[in-house]
Amino acid sequence: MSIRIIPQDELGSSEKRTADMIPPLLFPRLKNLYNRRAERLRELAENNPLGDYLRFAALIAHAQEVVLYDHPLEMDLTTRIKEASAQGKPPLDIHVLPRDKHWQKLLMALIAELKPEMSGPALAVIENLEKASTQELEDMASALFASDFSSVSSDKAPFIWAALSLYWAQMANLIPGKARAEYGEQRQYCPVCGSMPVSSMVQIGTTQGLRYLHCNLCETEWHVVRVKCSNCEQSGKLHYWSLDDEQAAIKAESCDDCGTYLKILYQEKDPKIEAVADDLASLVLDARMEQEGYARSSINPFLFPGEGE
C-alpha cells in the first residue's frame, strides 16, 4: 500500500465519508509540537548517559518553537498538490521541489536564537554556518536530501536539518487536500515529502491501536499496519526486541527479509512518549540491534551518520 495525496476538489462524496475511518495521514500538528519535544528531551536527559546531548537537542527544539511563530509561512500549494497527484508523486517531494529562500531565513533565525545558549565547539559550528554562502547552504541541504552524509559534517547536519524540517513542516501544515490509501510501492517513505521515518508509534485516542510512521522531516505521520515490515512490507520474519521486558514502551521491530529494523513506541505504555525524543534517548537499543546484525531503516534528525559510517 502507498498513500497518495488527493486534492480536495477531486474527492468524491464517498471518499470524503470514508477518509475519516482510518486516517491514512496525520498532517503536522505544529501547536506545541516543538515545546513538547523539548520538554520530553529534558525529561529523558535525567539519568541518561546521553543527557548532555539530549539537553542540546532540547535547545534546538525550543528554538524551532520560537522561530515557527516568529516566521510564519504563507504559500498556496493547491497547484502543486494537483500536479503531484497527477504524477503520483509526494506533493512536497524533497528530490524535486524547489526550495524557497524561506528555509535559509529560518536557519539564520534559529542560529540567532541558539547563539546565547551555545559555547565551545557548538558555537563555532553555528558561527561557521552563519558565515556560509547561500550556495554552500543549498549544497549541504541537497547532500542531506540525497543521503550523501559524507559531504556534510555530522555537527552541522542537525542545524541544517532543523531549518529544513521547520520549513517542510510549515508547508505540510498548509496542504489543502485529503489523503486516501492506494495500492503501490515505497510506503516506507513519507507520502508527503518522500523522506524517511524517524520511528513508528502505536497511538492512543481516536487512532487507538493504529501504527503510524513519523516523518523525520515534515513531521507528518502515515499509517502502516502492524506486524508488517515498514521497510519491505514482508511479514514472515519479524522479531521484536526490547531492553526491558515484553511490556516495554519502546521496542525494535526487525525483519530478516531485508535485514533492517525500526523502533515502535507505544503510547498506551507511556502517554508522554515522543517520536523523536524517545528514539534519540534509546540509542542503547540501536547498539544492541547493530550487534545483532540489523541496519537501521530510519534517521533521527539530531543524529546523522558521519563520514565513513
Swiss-Prot record:
Transmembrane segments: none annotated. Disulfide bonds: none annotated. Gene3D superfamilies: FdhE-like domain. One of its GO terms (cellular component) is cytosol. The keyword GTP-binding does not apply. Belongs to the FdhE family. Coiled coil: none annotated. InterPro entries: FdhE-like_sf, FdhE_C, FdhE_central, FdhE_N, Formate_DH_accessory. GO terms for molecular function: ferric iron binding. It is found in: Cytoplasm. The keyword Metal-binding does not apply. It comes from the Bacteria. Pfam families: FdhE_C (PF24860), FdhE_central (PF24859), FdhE_N (PF04216). GO terms for biological process: protein maturation. Keywords: Cytoplasm. This is Protein FdhE. Necessary for formate dehydrogenase activity. HAMAP family: FdeH (MF_00611).
